[in-house]
Amino acid sequence: MRILFLLFSLTFYLPGYSQRSETVYRTKGDSIQNYYKVLIPDTVSKGLLVIIGGFCGTPIDVMQETKLPETAVKAGYTVVIPYLVDDCSTIDSKNLYQTRLESVIPEVIKSYNIPKDKFIIGGQSLGGHRAMFYTEQAYKANNEKIIKPNAVFGVDPPLNMKRLWDTFTYLLRINFSEISIEESREQLRRFRIMYGGSPSQFPKNYEVASSYYPDAKDGGNAKYLKSVPVRLYCDPDINWIIENRRGSYATMNATDLSGCISQLKLLGNKNAEFVTCLGKGFKPDGTRHPHYFSMLDPEEFILWANKLLEIK
């Protein structure tokens, strides 16, 4: 299987250290989507770390925004950064991302000789939601074909699609920030296609698509994480939101994240954490922004992962 996939891959060494990197293209002739980057440690793999970027976030984008991939591979993890659907040019109304992710995980575990029982998945923004949703479906289905993560994390992901619809509607209505106006208009268009219309028209569609839904019993899909270690990172800088977006706590992903962790604790999850990263979010160019991967501390993350997976 690995020989076949590597026919369509590029292999090179990462600058500055000896680990190899491969980009595996799963569809012949398509270098735009359905591919993933693999960072390979120079030792026997200690485990698998899957990191999913945000909306339109390629593997290159992820590696520019956070040192987590290189920190993890230096610590002995095999790191996979997938780009399975090109969000910029398509609308994933059939959740093709989930289907492809379910097949990618066993593929890389087999191809790169990774321990099957040492697997953490996570991501930033939409990538964090996708990681949460994947984990929920894995534990919900109880299907051996869906590899179950030992833990899941998200860096400021939106979890409740109904709340996100309301946020976009508000930002469009107040007409304050040009960036917010453009994003809100485009995302509302996508939501209408993906879910059929608004949450009031199709509440069930929004519940099914959300990785946390406070209107549903036990948080909706979140209930499937009641026994899974969960970390949700957030830079809850309300003053930045007020000054730059004229938003409120209700428009922040922090609302979803704190609610989800509280719900998991109500369900008995003793390993559900809301990680506050106030003031730590920055763009790669150094511009302050509380919605960026940089809020996560890579070194501390690896200490957490090693302890969780009992890796020395």
Regions found by a protein language model. Give the residues of each.
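Primarily recognizes the serine-hydrolase "nucleophile elbow" in alpha/beta-hydrolase
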Residues: 110-111, 116-175
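Bacterial Sec-dependent N-terminal signal peptides
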Residues: 1-20
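N-terminal cap/lid segment of alpha/beta-hydrolase-fold proteins
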Residues: 18-43
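Serine-hydrolase catalytic core
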Residues: 193-273
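Short substrate-entry loop that stabilizes the transition state in hydrolases
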Residues: 44-46, 51-90, 242
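The alpha/beta-hydrolase serine catalytic core
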Residues: 166-214
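Alpha/beta-hydrolase active-site loop
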Residues: 92-113, 133
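Catalytic active-site module of serine/aspartate enzymes centered on a nucleophile-bearing elbow/loop
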Residues: 287-312
